[in-house]
Amino acid sequence: MIRYSRFITLGDSFTEGVGDIQIDGQFMGWADRVAERLAKQQPDFSFYNLAIRGKLVSQVIEDQIPEAMKWIEGPATLLSFHAGANDVLRPGYDPEVVLPQYREAVRKLAATGAQLLLFTAIERVAKSGKMQELWHQRFSTFNNNVRAIGLEVGAIVADANLDPDIASRRFLDTDRLHLNPAGHTRVAESVLELIGADFDPNWNAPLPPLPELGKIQSIQIEVQWITTFLIPWISRRIRGISSGDGRFAKHSAPIRLS
């Protein structure tokens, strides 16, 4: 296997680790889990997580890529880039702007010689409905863009849609958007397998069916989701603010994990 001496991650809440367990007030996340495992396999391993929740692809390009470029060490660096999902979720999303931005960012990062790691997004989060169809339409186009540019530059692409279980409620946080601790663990193991590192071979073993929710329980969950996530999300959109405003990256410089 290729032994990476450095892992740099760029992006939004997915890579920051929102929804995972918190340690000292910070979410752990799949990226930190991967970094800890890689550190056990490589002396003097360092990790740099620049991801911040709520960031749009243009913000990741402007704020995070210049910082990451300072620390890339060619093929010995594993470089994760996942941005654009927040753009896709916005009412005014314009794929003619966002998708080319994404491609150019990937080309710039690939030119450093680092091993790129890209991600697709879950395309189906519900069985049916107008919102599901809009979600599927937008994210399937976004994902095709990720796959195409990933193939062009020789990136490793972690395709969420090859793991249908990841969209089940057992792996999603109560906001239905972020992963829970089990979900972050699952993504970490899938990434470790993709990059040729030691991984848990049982991470994608068949799972028993989830118990059916009763009608009252389903209504309670729906009301809780609307009041704790949907209404605040709409409020932020109306006020033009982001969940990432005023936040800083977990690691402003590489940290040694071994």
Predicted regions and their residues:
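A short helix->loop->beta-strand "cap" motif at the edges of active sites that frequently abuts
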Residues: 43, 111-115, 155
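Conserved catalytic region of serine esterases and O-acyltransferases that act on ester linkages
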Residues: 152, 175-178, 182-258
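Charged helix-capping and loop-helix junction motifs
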Residues: 95-103, 135-142
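Substrate-gating cap/lid alpha-helix
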Residues: 126-160, 181
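Oxyanion-hole/transition-state-stabilizing segment in secreted/luminal serine hydrolases
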Residues: 16-20, 58-99, 123-124
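Residue-level recognition of beta-strand->loop/alpha-helix junctions
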Residues: 49-51, 120-121, 159-162
